[in-house]
Amino acid sequence: MTYVGAAEALRFPALEKVTGSMEITTSFVNGMYPTMLEEIYTPVLKRVGKLVMTSRANDETQYNTTITDLDCFSALERVDVIDIHKQGGLVSFKGLEKAIGSLDDEMSWLVGGNAYNPTFEEAKAGKLVKP
């Protein structure tokens, strides 16, 4: 499942499972200005193989700054890989707390280029919000 586009919101009210990769591009540069995804709604999503959030931006000034937390994934219980990059406003991973418990090792935690980038050890220890 891949989303690359310019919608303000992605809403999947009945989606419970993605067996493969769920890839969400949160900002898309069309011409000179980026369009940013503002909302992700997945209230019953319990399982994802690989969760990817990234941006098609070329530089930090075009990273998504509207998504500040991942509370949209608070129902997520199991994920094999979390890969989140280029989220300039992201300061809280608290919504992934249950899913982080299912991760096996630091190779399953790929995080960087965000406003907050907890290490695998910090995430497992519950340090999910930027101090």
Can you annotate each of these PLM segments?
Residues 1-131:
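Concave beta-strand-loop units of leucine-rich repeat
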